[in-house]
Amino acid sequence: MRGGTSAPDVLKMLLAKDPSRDVRQVAMIDARGRVAAHTGAKDIPAAGHITGTNFSVQANLMLNDTVWPAMAKAFTSAKGDLADRMMAALDAAQAAGGDIRGRQSAALIVVTGKPTGKPWSDRVFDLRVDDSAEPLKELHRLLVLQRAYNHMNAGDLAVENKDNDGALREYSAAAALVPDNLEMVYWHAVALVNMGRVDQSLPLFRRVFRADKNWLTLTPRLAKVGLLPSDQAVLGRILKAAD
């Protein structure tokens, strides 16, 4: 496919020389949105797939044969970004009966449409739950958390680009998603200080310090390595927020 061969042609070639094709299940989509899928005749029932515009859903070892149609319907009708739509498909699969063996694991990977050559930044979401009684519930939690971290990272980048207002919008968006995450509140406060907005930072520091004194211990260390101003008056005001 990297050389331009379509997904259907690639799958056809692979299956033609695969002696175990009857027990395979595979789906692929190329950069032009051409979709190909295969469910082997000897895959353990219930097994099957549905392809549509820019997507494929497939399943095997399901409780019943309504699972993948439910996935397709959910994916095509769900609102939101790609991650939201994929989660909707997974939720629908479970609601329709899911894996006959029960619930154990779930994963979600979303990459950018235009690779930059930096795999670590091209992966928008790379989440997995390897063993849980409620894997989809945990995956939902991780997705929200990762969205918040993505906002924090965007805020840090905005700070580097001297876009303070943009940074604060990103930090606020992160806080709205995970309001109880003390680390995000703390680094938001640190960013405010470095923008010269010490007064705005103090309520955030106060909240963090009162919840966990370790952040109070950490704060002078940041000043020593240049991540907070070395001005003792400023540092004193920050530390006093713990009172």
Model-identified regions with their sequence ranges:
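Alpha/propeptide regions of enzymes that mature by internal proteolysis
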Residues: M1-R101, L108, D130-N161, A176
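Short coil turns that delineate tetratricopeptide repeat
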Residues: P179, R210-N214
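Residue-level recognition of tetratricopeptide repeat
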Residues: D156-L157, V190, K224
